[in-house]
Amino acid sequence: APHRGKVGLLFQDPDDQLIGPTVLEDVEFGPLNLGWDAHRAHHAADDALDQVGLLHLSERPVHELSGGEKRLVALAGLLAMKPTVLLLDEPTVSLDNDTTERIIEILLASKLSMLIATHDPLCIDRLATRSVLLDRGAITDQSESVHQV
C-alpha cells in the first residue's frame, strides 16, 4: 500500500478513533503501526501532542478526557504519522468556541491539504479554499475563497 500513512482520517466521534489506554500510547499507536521504531514514534507523539497543546496530558487515561480533549488527541494521532492529506469528518462538531478555534488554528498551522465534511460555517470560512454545497447528494453550489490558507 504505497499511500499507507499518507492520508489521515479524523472521525466525527473521537471515541470511535481512540484506542490507547493513555493519551501518549494512543498517539504513538499510528506511527508504531506504520513500522516506526519506538524512539521515533515516541518523539513524533510528543511533537504532535505539543502541536495540539496537550503534552501535559500524555499520561492521562483517554477515558478521563473531555470531548474536546479527545478530538485534539485524535488529531494529534493523525499529525504524529506525518500525513500529506487530512480527511476530516465534522472536525468542530459539538465543541465549545475555544476548542473550535484551537482546532482551526492547528489545522491552519499544519499547512496540509484537507478534505472536510462539515456543517460549520466558521470551519468552511476559515479553512476552505474551495467549497461544494450538497443537498441530498446533489451539488447545489460551489465557490472558491479569496483568502490563502
State each model region's role.
Residues 39-57:
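Conserved ABC ATPase "signature" region
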Residues 61-65, 69:
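Conserved ABC ATPase signature
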Residues 75:
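Hydrophobic anchor residue at the start of the ABC signature
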Residues 86-89:
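Catalytic Walker B motif of ABC-type/P-loop ATPase nucleotide-binding domains
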Residues 92-93:
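Short loop immediately C-terminal to the Walker-B catalytic DE motif
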Residues 118-119:
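H-loop/switch region of ABC-family ATPase nucleotide-binding domains
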Residues 124-126:
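A short, surface-exposed alpha-helical micro-motif characterized by mixed small hydrophobic
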